[in-house]
Amino acid sequence: MTKLKKVMISLVAATLLLLAGCGSSAVVKTDAGNVTQDELYEAMKTTYGNEVVQQLTFKKILEDKYTVTEKEVNAEYKKYEEQYGDSFESTLSSNNLTKTSFKENLEYNLLVQKATEANMNVSESKLKTYYKTWEPNITVRHILVDDEATAKEIQTKLKNGEKFADLAKEYSTDTATSTNGGLLDPFGPGEMDETFEKAAYALKNKDDVSGIVKSTYGYHLIQLVKKTEKGTYAKEKANVKAAYIKSQLTSENMTAALKKELKAANIDIKDSDLKDAFADYTSTSSSSSTSTSN
């Protein structure tokens, strides 16, 4: 779960806010001496200060210009919940996270996405060019196993008439989908492992099954559930635009958008220990114009 680290930072941010300026009150008492709130604040600032002040500052700047609704956050949360299945809560817990703190981070990420989208130049010519290689979303089931021998064993059972979904429940090591018969959410080009995606799009008819596909995750068998024919540009324009925008939500473009937002906010860092917190966002480089040129 790639966003968990930022959630952990946001929890530290909340602690820093509570501790800032609290003074000499003890948070831990020992016979050897006390650990004061000031000492804890300074130690946490040294370790996490730059990352925390970045997130707190950007959140305040972005909230002033963009709105993320509870419905949007819940929709994003549900995607992760479905992706991780029964292991979702334990994954949060093992990373010292709660549902609330994870949703707070999702809200922040959505704010950054909206700022990035606002910084894009989505022209008609760019969409038409993108349409040429764009394909509609595809829906498949898959069975993931660790070794080729097991994949061949499953192939034999499929040839003998056993159902793909039943075999996914029995064999697949992808715990997020195995209980649902291996069913994956619809996906488009560029969203999955390249080898997996190529094999999935090569399937022509409903219920067709691929050969054994080796990816970075292991060995797959893929069954086609739904594949929509590509329509005309006029018919598909809304889908093409959504896919294009999604493809442009890269770290490079997000950084470029945040640089622009930071410059417009006229920030003034008062704590000398944090003077370099925004160095990556105030330096002048070619990347600062990346998102407007895509």
Curated annotation (Swiss-Prot):
Do you know which InterPro entries this protein is assigned to? Foldase_PrsA, PPIase_dom_sf, PPIase_PpiC, PrsA_foldase, Trigger_fac_C_sf, Trigger_fact/SurA_dom_sf
Q: Where in the cell is it found?
A: Cell membrane
* Residues bearing a lipid moiety (N-palmitoyl cysteine): 22
UniProt topology in membrane = Lipid-anchor
Q: One biological-process term from Gene Ontology?
A: protein folding
Question: What's a Pfam family this protein contains?
Answer: Rotamase_3
Q: Which UniProt keywords apply?
A: Cell membrane, Isomerase, Lipoprotein, Membrane, Palmitate, Rotamase, Signal
The Swiss-Prot or TrEMBL record annotates one GO molecular function as:
peptidyl-prolyl cis-trans isomerase activity
Q: Where is the signal peptide?
A: 1-21
What is the first-listed, main subcellular location in coarse terms?
Answer: membrane
* Residues linked to a lipid group, S-diacylglycerol cysteine type: 22
Report the function annotation for this chain. Answer: Plays a major role in protein secretion by helping the post-translocational extracellular folding of several secreted proteins.
Which family would the database say this protein is a member of? Belongs to the PrsA family.
Protein name in UniProt: Foldase protein PrsA 1
